[in-house]
Structures are given as C-alpha cells and as structure tokens.
Design a protein with these regions (language model features):
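Catalytic His-Asp segment of secreted/periplasmic serine-dependent ester chemistry enzymes
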Residues: 187-265
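N-terminal secretory targeting modules
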Residues: 1-87, 91-104, 261-265
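Oxyanion-hole/transition-state-stabilizing segment in secreted/luminal serine hydrolases
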Residues: 93-107, 121-165, 170, 181, ...
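Second-shell loop/turn segments in exported
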Residues: 111-114, 150-157, 192-195, 238-243
Length: 265
C-alpha cells in the first residue's frame, strides 16, 4: 500500500514539474509574441511629397496637434496683418522658443510663424491650400521645408523638390505679389560621410536653386554658416545636429536680415 502511495506521489510531483516547465517554456514565447506585436505596430501611411496631404496617424485620421496648430494659423491669416510669414517645419517652429530675438528682428514686419514640428512638403502644401493664406497678403514668405522628407525613404529627391515647387505655386495662386525667400534646406548630421539625410538635402537644394528668378522667388543658401571648415556640424549650434539652439537662430537672423529687408520694402 505504502509502495503504491509513493508511486502516486512521485507521479503527481513529476506532473507538477512538467507543467511548471511547460509554463516557463511558454513565457519566452509569449514575450517574443509581445515584441513581435509591438514591432508590427501600424505606422502612418506613406504620402507622396508633391501632393497635398494633412499629417495623419496610423489610423489614417488627421493628427490632432497638427489640426489645432493649422486652425490657429488660419485665424492669424484672417487678420491680414502679417507682412512676413515664416513657413516650414520644427526648425521654423523653433523660433517660438526665441521670442525675444524674433520680436527684435521681425516685429517691424508683424511677422507670423507658421512652422509645425514634423511637417513635410505635402503637409505644408495642404496647409497653404486649406486656409493659411486666405485673407493674408504678406510681402515675403520665408520658406524652408524638406528635411523631414529626406529623413525617410518614402520620397525621392525629385519628388521633394516638386513638393517645394508646388508650395510656391500655391502661395502665388493666393497672393501673386508675395516674394518667396526660399532657404536651402539646412545641413544635418555630423558630417558628409555616411549621412544620407544630408546628401539628399544637398541634392534637393541643387534642384530648388533653379527656382530662383530674382523676382518672385529668391533662393538663399545659408547652410555653410552652420558648418565648421571641415564640413562638420557643431553641436554648439545644432545640439542634435538637426535643430538650431539660440546661437543657431542668431546665425540665421544675421544671415537673412539684409535680404529680408530688401524683399520686404
């Protein structure tokens, strides 16, 4: 009897160990499944750089922050006061963090900042076509856009340049006498080597430089002012090698001051 009881107890313990081992074996598989699900999380659908489109999330709906900022810009435009509009992505939006410098340099123009972080050419084109230039006839638009397109593989150099061209056309359709101060896309990344984003920006700049007509479109490349002699980008100017800090914005202000004054007469 004792022998049978011992056998039964042994079998029970063996079953528990087996089940425990099976549970432990399941954990890595479950963890791996979680990682796989996370890795396969949906992303926002790709968009052509030269066709107007709002910024959307993975669900295909317009990004709420983008929509809110756009609506605020539409209201500013309705006032019809701004003689100069800065239009672009986070590098343009970054002027909001340099209010004293912005006021000092651009209050005389009643300047408006229409920069939105993360914007690409298609987003700026959509904004122009959807109210941001209704009721406003600025003397000058300072336009720089495209680095966020260059930072991804979705858009070709030609497509990005076409997107910029379409933005200029859309502006002039709404306010024909406005002059566009078209800034070359700023350099990005540490240096020239192994830097596809900078290489792509340079290629786009080579195309958009040809948009310059000396009348309504004025191409202006100030990129070299941010670079050291060896072509590297100092973190003292762009800490993340993409966005300007106060020193960087001062460099930009100094670089465009004379040209902007000339165009805004």
């Amino acid at each position: 009897m004792k022998s049978k009881l011992s056998i039964l107890l042994g079998l029970s313990l063996l079953a528990q160990v087996s089940l425990s081992g099976a549970d432990e074996a399941k954990k890595p598989a479950a963890d791996a499944a979680k990682v796989a699900v996370k890795a396969a999380a949906p992303k926002a659908p790709g968009q052509p750089a030269d066709i107007a489109a709002p910024k959307v999330g993975a669900d295909g709906k317009i990004n709420a922050g983008f929509q809110k900022q756009h609506e605020a810009f539409v209201e500013i435009a309705k006032k019809g006061e701004a003689q100069v509009v800065f239009l672009g992505d986070s590098i343009t939006a970054g002027w909001n963090g340099q209010k004293a410098l912005f006021e000092k340099e651009y209050a005389q123009y009643k300047a408006a900042n229409f920069g939105i972080g993360g914007d690409r050419t298609q987003h700026v084109l959509w904004r122009v076509e959807n109210g941001e230039f209704e009721g406003i006839k600025p003397k000058v638009v300072v336009l720089m856009i495209g680095t966020n397109n260059s930072g991804v593989g979705d858009n070709s150099v030609d497509q990005i340049a076409a997107g910029i061209k379409n933005i200029i056309t859309a502006i002039h359709k709404r306010t024909p006498d406005t002059k566009v101060l078209l800034l070359a896309i700023f350099p990005r990344g540490a240096g020239e080597t192994g830097n596809p984003g900078r290489t792509k920006n340079k290629a786009v700049n080579e195309i958009i430089a040809k948009f310059h007509d000396g009348k309504k479109v004025h191409y202006f490349d100030i990129g070299a002012k941010f670079l050291a002699a060896d072509g590297t980008l100092s973190k003292e100017i762009m800490p993340d090698q993409l966005h300007l800090n106060p020193k960087g914005y001062q460099i930009e202000a100094d670089a465009i001051r004379e040209k902007l004054a000339e165009l805004a007469k």
